[in-house]
Amino acid sequence: MTLQRRTSSLSETHAAGRELATLLEPGDIILLSGQLGAGKTALTQGIAAGLGVSERVTSPTFTLVRQHACSVESGITTLHHADVYRTNSLDEIEDLALHELVEQGGVAIIEWGEMAAPLLGAAAWRIRFEVIDDEVRDIIIDESSVGTRLDGVREWTSK
């Protein structure tokens, strides 16, 4: 089963990310999927803001992974933001050691997460974007992927 939240603008997607950040815990991995321009980076920017990241967050398409320090108040040390679009194999994704990055109290968000799902799927939140029109997006979360935070995610999707 899935849960869904619709956003109607970039600012609403950012706000949804800020709110979602309050549900995250150290060690979480989030796999984001959706077509180009669907809102993966926008949601990540909102999550980063919610975690107290002070620097600008952009898609790490050419660097593959970027680290951003989070505020102490968030309880999360680092946001590891990955984009595996330009990888060519599961071996290349595995070499990024994304699962190890979160072991020190961080959170990892992986754009084009469907490519990493065979390696991380069981241990990761799965969030998919559907483009409805130029501005409107459906953010769809696989409810089996959020574990004990299902009630919080249900509340998040009801907004």
PLM regions and their residue ranges:
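Short phosphate-coordinating micro-motif centered on Lys-Gly-acidic
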Residues: 3-4, 91, 99-159
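Phosphate-binding P-loop
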Residues: 21-27
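P-loop (Walker A) phosphate-binding loop of NTP-binding proteins
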Residues: 35
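Conserved lysine of the Walker
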Residues: 40
